[in-house]
């Protein structure tokens, strides 16, 4: 499958296209992982439920960047605020994450944040769990339709 062309890409290396088995290994290897949940994931009930199961299975801390009632998806925090804390290697929710998972945000926003993190924190493993490929992450799912994307999330959770 050819990778989509991204006119904003400023780095020569791109994200590894990863599926559920590889992502499971990456998640298990992390000591302190952080999930940043955006508005698209909050609005889609099935996506949101799968993320809550994924968070429980891999013991991830979570930050929700969208208005959401409840704290199932973590503390409310803006994506820029979370990115600034990550770039400065400051604790986010009391931990110094070694893995950050972006899901549910717009692709251009996710890409910009990941470009900044790639420059400021090369030691941080960055994963994009969106239906669109994100070249600035270390690992990203390929561009797929919503149904295939949810199947990948189900495979990650083990459903």
From Swiss-Prot:
The gene is cdhB. Belongs to the CdhB family. One of its GO terms (biological process) is methanogenesis, from acetate. SUPFAM superfamilies: DHS-like NAD/FAD-binding domain. It comes from Methanopyrus kandleri (strain AV19 / DSM 6324 / JCM 9639 / NBRC 100938). This is Acetyl-CoA decarbonylase/synthase complex subunit epsilon. It holds the Pfam family CO_dh. Heterotetramer of two alpha and two epsilon subunits. The ACDS complex is made up of alpha, epsilon, beta, gamma and delta subunits with a probable stoichiometry of (alpha(2)epsilon(2))(4)-beta(8)-(gamma(1)delta(1))(8). Part of a complex that catalyzes the reversible cleavage of acetyl-CoA, allowing autotrophic growth from CO(2). The alpha-epsilon subcomponent functions as a carbon monoxide dehydrogenase. The precise role of the epsilon subunit is unclear; it may have a stabilizing role within the alpha(2)epsilon(2) component and/or be involved in electron transfer to FAD during a potential FAD-mediated CO oxidation.
């Amino acid at each position: 499958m050819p990778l989509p062309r991204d006119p904003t890409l400023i780095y020569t290396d791109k994200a590894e296209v990863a599926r559920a088995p590889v992502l499971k290994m990456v998640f298990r290897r992390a000591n302190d992982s952080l999930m940043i949940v955006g508005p698209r994931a909050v609005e889609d009930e099935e996506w949101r439920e799968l993320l809550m199961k994924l968070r429980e299975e891999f013991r991830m801390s979570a930050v929700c960047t969208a208005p959401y009632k409840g704290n199932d998806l973590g503390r409310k925090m803006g994506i820029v605020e979370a990115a600034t804390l990550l770039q400065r290697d400051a604790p986010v929710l009391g931990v110094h994450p070694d893995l950050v998972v972006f899901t549910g945000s717009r692709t251009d926003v996710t890409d910009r944040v990941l470009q900044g993190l790639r420059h400021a924190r090369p030691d941080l493993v960055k994963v994009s769990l969106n239906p669109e490929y994100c070249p600035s992450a270390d690992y990203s799912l390929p561009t797929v339709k919503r149904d295939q994307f949810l199947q990948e999330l189900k495979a990650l959770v083990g459903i």
